[in-house]
Each structure stands twice: as C-alpha cells, then as structure tokens.
From Swiss-Prot:
pH-activity profile: Optimum pH is 7.5.
The protein's name in its UniProt record: L-proline trans-4-hydroxylase
Temperature impact on function: Optimum temperature is 25 degrees Celsius.
Family per record: Belongs to the PhyH family.
C-alpha cells in the first residue's frame, strides 16, 4: 500500500519533533458525548478514578475504554487507529487510556517526565514503539495548565533522575499517577534541553487532537484559572512491542494486545 505525501511529511515531522498536530478533530456533538461520559465516571467510586492529594477533586481516570461503550468506540475510530498504525509501522492495540483532569483552581502540575520511563522500568516495554494521542475535551489555554513539550527531546533516550541518586524506588502504582511522579526529569536537565530545542505549549479548542512520542520530555503547570482543563489520552502500542510480564493494574496497563479493529466511521 502506498503512503501519501502528506502522511510521509507527517511521519518525518513526528520523527523529528516527537509531536504532531492532527488534522482529525472531534466534532462538537462527539466532544459533548465524551464530556458527559467522563463526568459521569468521575462521580463513581472505583479504583480507576484518582483524586488530587488531600482533595476530593478528580485528577485522572484510567481504563475507561474497558467499561464504557463511548470510550470503547473512540479508541476504534479509523482516523486514530490508521494514524497510529502508519506512525508505528504495524498493527496496534490500546496500551493505556486515561483522562487527565485539571479542575479549576485545583488541578496540580505534572513535573517534567517521559512516559516511556514508566513503561520500560515498570512494565518491561522493550522499545518506545507506541504513540500517545491527546484529545482536548475542554478548550486548552496558556492559563489552565496546558501540556508543554520539548520538541526533539525524544532523541535523548530515557533521561534518568540524577537529582536523587540512591533513592529507593517505589513500585506503588499510585506514585505513577500523582503529582509526585516516580520517574522525573530533573529541572536542570529539562532546562538545558529546552534551551537547545525550545518548549512548545500545546493549546487549542475542544476537539483538538495531538500525537506525541513516549520519550518526549513533557510537563504541565498548575491550573490557576477558573476553567477546567480536561485532556483524554489514548496510547497505542505496536503489537510486536507488547510487554511480557506487566504487573501494574490492568486499568493502567492493558493485558489484551489484540489488534484494534476500526469501526465503520469517524464518529461516536
């Protein structure tokens, strides 16, 4: 099958920069449908719902595609699956599904980190042959804690946390989803890389979609605004890159590496 020139350009840009704005955006009705489901799940008491430390504010939701029909259809939209397969060069499955919610005035920051550090050290993923696709469910602005990436930083490989040498690691999964992350990139290293490559804030209206590399260094600030910032993230992993013995809960790391079969149309 031939690859179109625009897709080749996209693959080159993704390989160079580690992130890519997607031409596919969710329609307003689909965004509203997802918001409704996410808000409903947020009110449930279940392990997939993570709260901010010392607060009743919801920080994140995990694995919603395993128990919610709307989220299950979302991960099978042809535009998303097709892009993931083209970027990764083969069949993919859903490795992670999460919704990061920064509540107005309460949403805490995510420090500089790389997703692949968690997946490699905790789950045994062999290579960063995966892709994150972020979908904005709210308008994301400079004020409500947007995702910030260091373009090209994925080429540095895994940047170990040298700021705390000898620190005993915790394998409690809660330390992988809180504001006090287990694997972080020290500010001085992130600052040095940012000085070389720059920093890009990923903002846009609700429905915007962005792809980014598992090894790209990224962070986000506190939400000090009066507007919530909700971003849904789907991680597609190449089937041949499936970790052999993941130990974290299934709602964090899928055990089902069956290739995703797209639905018939790009709508929910």
């Amino acid at each position: 099958m031939s690859v179109s020139a625009p897709l080749l350009d996209a693959k080159v840009r993704y390989g160079r920069d580690g992130w890519l704005p997607l031409p596919h955006t969710l329609s307003d009705p689909d965004v509203r449908k997802l918001r409704q489901r996410i808000e409903g799940i947020s009110r449930e008491q279940r392990p997939e719902v993570v709260l901010e430390e010392g607060s009743s504010a919801v920080r994140a939701l995990h694995g919603c595609h395993d128990f919610d029909e709307v989220c299950a259809r979302l991960v099978r939209l042809p535009a998303l699956v097709g892009l993931a397969e083209q970027l990764l060069g083969g069949p993919v499955y859903v490795y992670q599904f999460k919704v990061n919610m920064k509540q107005a005035h309460e949403g805490a920051a995510w420090p500089w980190h790389q997703d692949f550090a968690f997946w490699h050290h905790e789950d045994g993923m062999g290579a960063p042959d995966a892709v994150n696709i972020a979908i904005f469910l709210d308008d994301v602005t400079d004020e409500n804690g947007p995702l910030e990436v260091i373009p090209g930083s994925q080429h540095a490989g895994i940047v170990e946390d040298t700021a705390r040498p000898g620190r005993e690691r915790s394998h409690d999964w809660r330390h992988h989803v809180s504001a006090k992350l287990e694997y972080v990139v020290p500010d001085e290293i992130a600052g040095r890389l940012a000085g070389t490559f720059g920093v890009r804030r990923l903002t846009g209206p609700a429905g915007t979609a962005v792809a980014f590399h598992p090894s790209i260094i990224h962070s986000s600030s506190n939400n000090t605004s009066a507007q919530r910032r909700c971003v849904l993230l789907i991680t597609y992993n190449r089937v041949t890159n499936t970790p052999a013995h993941p130990v974290r809960p299934p709602f964090l790391v899928s055990r089902d590496s069956t290739p995703v079969v797209p639905v018939d149309a790009d709508r929910l």
